[in-house]
Structure formats: C-alpha cells, structure tokens
C-alpha cells in the first residue's frame, strides 16, 4: 500500500518533515500517519495538519507528494527503502543521510540534497541548489555512497568532501565542484565555475563543458577521446599531501585555460596581464601576528607582497611594485620574482591586502574563496604606493 500527500495550503513557516519516509509509513494506518510529528518552526505538530493523506493501491512503500513543498525540509532524511515521488519543487536537505530507496522530483530542489548519504538514488528532473552530496558544516566527510542525478543545473560546492558514490549533472555546475573530494565520481555535462577539484585528494571529476579557471595545483597527464570529445586528464590537487585526484576537462572548450600554459601571444592590456590569484597563510605571517598585532612594518613586509613567476615578472618589465585588481578593487604590492610560482598565477599571503581582492562568495566548507580568482596584474606607476593596513581598512572596510 502506498500513500498520496497533498499540501492543504501554502507553508507560511518552513516545515521540518523527516518523518515523511516510506520505511516509517510501512505498517501504519492513515490515522497513525496523520499523527506523525513534524516541526513548524520550533513547535511540534501532526503531519495531518499540513497534508491531505490518502491511500493508493498502486505500489508498496511508495509516497507520492503532489504540490509545492519548497518550504518543507528533510523529506526522505535517513530513509532506508521505498520510493518517494514529488510532483513539485522541494526544500532543503532532501534525502540527507539516506541509506537506501529512491527519491524522484519532477521539479526543482533547494540546497543540501543528499548530504552525507550512504546509499539509494536521488533523481531531480530539474535544477538543484548548492552543496549537493556535501558534508555538514564542520564535517569533512560528505556523500559516502549512492547516486544523485540532476537533469538540470546545480549550484556551488557540489560533492564537497565526497567519499564515494556518483553525482551526475546534466547541465551546468557552479564554483568549487568537487571541493575536498576524497573519492567517488562527479560528471558535469555542461559548464562549471572556477576552481573545480580544489583541495581534492582522490576521486574523479569529468567536466564536458567550459570551466572558468583551473587551479595551479593540477598537472596535465594525458589527452584522449571520450564520447567523441577530446578530453585532458589532470592530476591534483598538488597543494594537498599525496593527491590522487583525476580531473578531466574538454580540450576544445577550454583553450583559454590551456593558452595560459605558454607565454606565446600574451599581451599587456591597459589593465595588465590576466592571471590567477591564490592566497594562503605563511609561517612568517603566523609568527608576526602571534601577539595579535597586524599593524607593524614586519607585517606589511610579509603580507603586502605579490609572488610572480619569472616569465610574468620579465613580461611586466621586472617591476618594483605591482597593482593587482579584481571586482573593481585594486591593491599595490611589492613585486617578488619567485621560481616556485607557475606562469599565469600569483601568490599573495593571506591578510588585509589579499582581502581587498577576495570575492564576496564565502559560503564553503573552508576557505577556497582564496583560490583560483581571475585578476589583472600590471606594473605600478611612480605615484602608486603600498597602503598601510590602517589605510586599507579605512578605504575598503576589510577586516583586521
């Protein structure tokens, strides 16, 4: 015996309905199902207050929801068996910690679907939000098994901390696809945003469309054909210990990435040369600010610098200072030629000067917003000087 649920009205307050599960409904009569508890805000109420519930003879362990449940969270959370069909849009955390069974949505879903799921299948015949198959905040281990299929587009941080399982996206994906991935496979048939595979140590990511930027921690290994497309395999992320991650991208759709591997034809525009900005804390920086004081000459000397590859340093005319600009902001930094920096990238110690360039996107399981940012780099003129930490705080409002 299956059941059909129809919302009685629009949900004014989000509902937490982790009791909508086929394995929990099994063996219960209609009155018992209507009495199952859900949370409206912080108040427990019976499920029957919000849904018309009827039996259907078509299938056992089936729940069909007809209507908009975009403000209902945790549907199918922890389910072990059975099937849920939703004809409408769905809210947050659909199928989180799911262990078995199947969920199919004929509509769009919000963020955090399939969080830390262990098994089963989630199929979305529409679009999905951020953090598909991701880890909970404060946790590093995401999806551990099962399969998520999204026929449309998906948002940022897909498969964050993923350990095993499969995620398939038929459309486009946002930034940081496969961040901190440690196993499993992600396939994106469309385009993806910046820095796919950031901090991944294992697993497979295949992107058949265009990516915005590639992190310098990925090394090209080989080129081959797959489904009629020429693909390139990269290994990484080499910024991690013993990385075994495999990132595949489409050759013909990512010539803008591959062209950065050579200085042939690179030109300096009015803005300068386009490079990829990365940042991170340094040991010296930690020693300086251990006492909590960042407003020192030593701090400026360590953090107000831009490490540049020898090729780009020479292309810019071996400058003393450079101007780095992004998103309408710019900062003057001391230029440092560094053979350890890959051509087409720069490194700025993470601090107040780096914060001027950091995009506002900060929703992540860590701090990858400091990686893979496209910026412009040019030689500073005589009148452009390095601002102190206090001046930057006053001008841009960046935190200390």
Swiss-Prot record:
Catalysis: reaction(s): N-formylmethanofuran + 2 oxidized [2Fe-2S]-[ferredoxin] + H2O = methanofuran + 2 reduced [2Fe-2S]-[ferredoxin] + CO2 + H(+)
Pathway stated in the Swiss-Prot or TrEMBL entry: One-carbon metabolism; methanogenesis from CO(2); 5,10-methenyl-5,6,7,8-tetrahydromethanopterin from CO(2): step 1/3
Enzyme class label: oxidoreductase
Keyword Oxidoreductase attached: yes
First and last residues of every Sequence repeat: 76-88, 95-107, 114-126, 140-152, 159-171, 178-190, 197-209
InterPro entries named in the record: Asp_de-COase-like_dom_sf (IPR009010), FmdC/FwdD_MopB-bd (IPR041717), Formylmethanofuran_DH_csu/dsu (IPR012048), Formylmethanofuran_DH_suC (IPR017550), Glu_synth_asu_C_sf (IPR036485), MoPterin_dinucl-bd_dom (IPR006657)
Region (7 X 13 AA repeats of [GW]-X-X-M-X-X-G-X-I-X-[IV]-X-G): 76-209
Cross-referenced Gene3D superfamilies: 2.40.40.20, Glutamate synthase, alpha subunit, C-terminal domain (2.160.20.60)
Any one biological process term the GO annotation gives: methanogenesis, from carbon dioxide
Expression induction: By growth on molybdenum, under anaerobic conditions.
Pfam families listed in its UniProt record: Molydop_binding
Keywords, alphabetical: Methanogenesis, Oxidoreductase, Repeat
Family: In the N-terminal section; belongs to the FwdC/FmdC family. In the C-terminal section; belongs to the molybdenum dinucleotide binding protein family.
Name of the protein described by the UniProt record: Molybdenum-containing formylmethanofuran dehydrogenase 1 subunit C
Organism name: Methanothermobacter thermautotrophicus (strain ATCC 29096 / DSM 1053 / JCM 10044 / NBRC 100330 / Delta H) (Methanobacterium thermoautotrophicum)
Gene: fmdC
